[in-house]
């Protein structure tokens, strides 16, 4: 296993991190807890020392199972990363309650890497008003958290604003060879690294879509390469090729995939790809773009939208759905990111057809017309799904307040 150093702390982290959002399931659809624990320990025994979870993953069960997996001496071998969900925070007491509950759930006295989860511009402004920086300072001072950071799918401008707002130790962004200009992108990666922040990467395989069953035209490119690698290995090596990257998270839930990722992480040095390797990846990237429904490059010239639509983000989800129609999670990711579930609503259905975006688009895309297509394809169930999921998150938060009441802290119940 190769390791990279967190600039501000000197902490040495495995370049491969274990993402705890996609645990293996049983035939009946529940989490296969025994297999999950075996897989987590398999990764740790192979050198992984960074594990990333969150309260919302598996509707609260991810942290519970991770805490159990880290018994028997495994906690001392790793760094735990988990997240504070802004959508469950309404006052400073909620911050305290959620963190203390996480410590109990994870069976630990401290969180090594603590993130504000999936920050958007509005959720970040709300958290600042509620005193998030004072909370982070206090939690670091009393030892409950060691390092503070954030994750985000926001555009580059918002990302830079968040980076500049606080003395963060690290951040977490989506990054892969299709997202060089999407969300924070390469510019954001380099900007954060220039601030001496560690950068953790999520979605290096775009939820697994850049691995496994890829379009035939893409597989043909990999097959013609002089070096034989799986689609997953090509994608992971591309991310690790960037020296600014600290950890790449993989939602590993298959023993063979864990072994493959561990093998690749033994040799994936920054700057290790040859020019012909990069040319092969660029051909695959260009073919993906050719296959996409919308030729959006994610440049952001169309933003901000007066109606609040995340135009590049909506197009990215729409293209992913077109490329990987077998992936049933794409629409749910769209709803989560743009349907108002974990931040302000930014879906295509908000488009007012004003045309401002089309005038600014360097690709000359008919954006208002395309927004109708995106809404038609991606938002059919949004009016039903979002209220249901929001209700679930509200119940999780309410249960926390009830727990606080029955344990005696009645002043905040």
Residue positions per predicted region:
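Structural motif
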Residues: 42, 46, 105-106, 166, ...
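Short catalytic-loop micro-motif centered on adjacent basic/acidic residues
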Residues: 50-56, 146-150, 172-173, 247-249, ...
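Conserved, mostly hydrophobic/aromatic
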Residues: 6, 18, 43, 51, ...
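Structural motif corresponding to the early beta-alpha repeats
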Residues: 57, 73-92, 117
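Structured C-terminal cap/extension of enzyme domains
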Residues: 49, 68, 187-413
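Glycine/proline-rich, positively charged
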Residues: 27, 31, 87-205, 213-219, ...
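Conserved residues at the C-terminal ends of beta-strands
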Residues: 19, 54-57, 114-117, 151, ...
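N-terminal binding-site loop/beta-alpha segment at the start of enzyme catalytic domains
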Residues: 1-78, 141
């Amino acid at each position: 296993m190769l390791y990279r150093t967190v600039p501000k702390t000197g902490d040495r982290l495995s370049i491969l991190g274990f993402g705890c959002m996609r645990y293996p399931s049983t035939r009946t659809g529940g989490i296969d807890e025994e297999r999950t624990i075996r897989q987590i320990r398999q990764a740790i025994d192979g050198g992984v020392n960074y594990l990333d979870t969150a309260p919302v993953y598996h509707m609260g069960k991810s942290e519970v199972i991770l805490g159990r997996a880290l018994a028997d001496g495994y906690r001392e071998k790793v760094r735990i990363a988990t997240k504070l969900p802004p959508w469950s925070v309404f006052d400073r007491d909620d911050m305290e309650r959620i963190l203390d509950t996480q410590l109990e759930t994870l069976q630990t006295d401290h969180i090594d890497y603590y993130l504000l989860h999936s920050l958007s511009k509005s959720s970040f402004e709300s958290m600042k008003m509620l005193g998030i920086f004072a909370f982070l300072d206090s939690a670091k001072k009393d030892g409950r958290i060691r390092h503070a950071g954030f994750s985000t799918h926001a555009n580059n401008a918002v990302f830079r604003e968040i980076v500049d707002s606080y003395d963060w130790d690290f951040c977490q962004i989506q990054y892969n060879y299709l997202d060089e200009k999407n969300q924070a992108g390469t510019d954001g990666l380099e900007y954060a690294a220039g601030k001496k922040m560690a950068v953790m990467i999520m979605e290096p395989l775009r939820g697994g879509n850049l691995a496994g069953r890829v379009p035939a035209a893409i597989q043909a490119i990999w097959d013609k390469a002089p070096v034989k690698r799986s689609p997953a290995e090509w994608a992971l090596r591309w991310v690790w090729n960037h020296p600014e990257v600290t950890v790449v998270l993989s939602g590993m839930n298959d023993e063979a995939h864990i072994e493959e990722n561990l093998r690749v992480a033994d040799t994936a040095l920054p700057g290790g790809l040859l020019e012909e390797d990069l040319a092969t990846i660029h051909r695959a990237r260009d073919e993906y773009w050719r296959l996409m429904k919308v030729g959006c490059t994610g440049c952001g010239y169309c933003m901000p939208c007066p109606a609040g639509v995340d135009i590049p983000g909506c197009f990215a989800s729409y293209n992913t759905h077109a490329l990987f129609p077998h992936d049933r999670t794409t629409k749910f990711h769209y709803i989560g990111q743009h349907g108002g579930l974990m931040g302000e609503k930014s879906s295509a259905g908000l488009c007012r057809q004003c045309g401002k975006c089309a005038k600014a688009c360097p690709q000359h895309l008919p954006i208002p017309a395309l927004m109708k297509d995106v809404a038609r394809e991606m938002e059919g169930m949004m009016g039903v799904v979002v209220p249901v999921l929001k209700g679930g998150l509200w119940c999780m938060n309410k249960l926390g307040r009830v727990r606080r009441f029955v344990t005696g802290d009645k002043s905040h119940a």
